[in-house]
Amino acid sequence: MRLCAGLFLSAAALAAHAAALNINFSDAAGKPLLDAVALLEPATGKALVKPMADVEVSQAKRQFAPRVTLITVGTKVTFPNFDTVRHHVYSFSPIKTFELKLYAGVPNAPVTFDKPGVAVLGCNIHDTMAAWIVVTDTPWFARSAANGRARIEGVPAGNYRLRLWHAGLGPGIEPAPVAITVGAADVEHSARLAVSTEP
């Protein structure tokens, strides 16, 4: 009984000391940047991650939604088609190569993303359709909203590497990681990326 109580108290103590990292993303012109990704990795070692449940990247009005999806390694993703036309979804990215040939409705099986990295999605029928799936092996991550803000919650105290990504940076390009120290209080960080959002 004492052991159980001790374990409970230890877990509660960890939760009490967890903080949040708030990132304010902006583009090259200083405007809020949508769909920027922040990945917080331990400075040493690896953190335990579990696959996420019920992740969908849909097709509607000949567009992918969402355009950027952030998942953990091992997550299965379904690709429902809500359009009245058929789509041919594919990725030729090294972390995951697959094709869902001409289909309507929901494919028979989801696609499992079992390696970290970025998978670029396209449609073999509609060339203007594009989306990105960012696969991470850390449990601390976030994607920025339209106001450029992203928030990673529940981060234990310690030293970390902050990795940043945005599709507008180009394939395989990401800024150098930033060293971040998390304590008991929330941490604020601003990131200006060399991305142009002008039409």
Across the structure, where does each feature detected by a protein language model lie?
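Bacterial N-terminal signal peptides that target proteins for export
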Residues: 1-8
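Extracytoplasmic copper-binding redox domains, predominantly the cupredoxin/blue-copper superfamily
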Residues: 18-199
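N-terminal signal peptide c-region/cleavage motif recognized by signal peptidases
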Residues: 13-16
